[in-house]
């Protein structure tokens, strides 16, 4: 009952008590936003630029990224920096991390914002994983680990570095099944919705485990449900489903709010390994996401998948 209540109650959150006007000045801070060319990512980049941050907009499509950068420059007067990153290809992930590290010694905030939702089951990553789990979890894990030296270099006891990972209310709808993530008979019995739940639950487990492993080194790691937001994530839904969903969806300005709060507010900087809910509030993920044994198992599994890339 608790998981169902958490899921449904977050669809209609109370009015926010925190807005982007409450964000601190971010001059001198280096930030990466994955999936920054569209949706909540693009809105987050916009607000971060307005608050003085140096922002790397990480995206797969150079054309779409540069179009977004131009739009944002016209709107804010500041220019984000394109970082090529295809989270569905672990080789591309390494190249993207290496390009960033060749330009910057420090990374103050990483927003693991990009995501794939309800993609057809025949769609796989370059290395043969389910596209949703591979992009949302494996790709972000690999990228985070590779840029960790820059996060650690930026982190101090008074100014901790932050990693903010976007999950969703789908984390409440199931637990991890390690047999489903690579292409094979077990996965092929499942539907896109099942795999989305796997990835969003996995996002929270990863974020909690990151906090557990690196909190003592001044790394803050939170995950969040951005809310029910009108974005390109719905592109794999049917026109009818999109129309029905649209009734319940909020604009991206609201969708970016919770991750910006988690990534920049002093209040969120006093916590670690937490799950944030709309709008800009502390919440609770499904209890299994905090199990240290599950976190350790997932982390070690992810390391094994990424070690050759």
Curated annotation (Swiss-Prot):
InterPro entries tied to this protein: NAD(P)-bd_dom_sf, SDR_fam
Documented EC number(s): 1.1.1.-
SUPFAM superfamilies, per the entry: NAD(P)-binding Rossmann-fold domains (SSF51735)
Any matching Pfam family: adh_short
Catalytic residues, chain numbering: 167 (proton donor), 196 (proton acceptor), 200 (lowers pka of active site tyr)
Positions with a binding annotation for NADP(+): 64, 86, 113, 145, 196, 200
Protein function: Short-chain dehydrogenase/reductase, part of the gene cluster that mediates the biosynthesis of melleolides, a range of antifungal and phytotoxic polyketide derivatives composed of an orsellinic acid (OA) moiety esterified to various sesquiterpene alcohols. The first step in melleolides biosynthesis is performed by the delta(6)-protoilludene synthase PRO1 which catalyzes the cyclization of farnesyl diphosphate to protoilludene.
Family named by the database record: Belongs to the short-chain dehydrogenases/reductases (SDR) family.
Note: Armillaria species are both devastating forest pathogens and some of the largest and oldest terrestrial organisms on Earth. They forage for hosts and achieve immense colony sizes via rhizomorphs, root-like multicellular structures of clonal dispersal. One genetic Armillaria gallica individual localized in Michigan's Upper Peninsula stands out as exceptionally large, covering hundreds of tree root systems over approximately 75 hectares of the forest floor. Based on observed growth rates of the fungus, the minimum age of this large individual can be estimated as 2500 years.
Protein name as annotated: Short-chain dehydrogenase/reductase ARMGADRAFT_1048226
Organism: Armillaria gallica (Bulbous honey fungus)
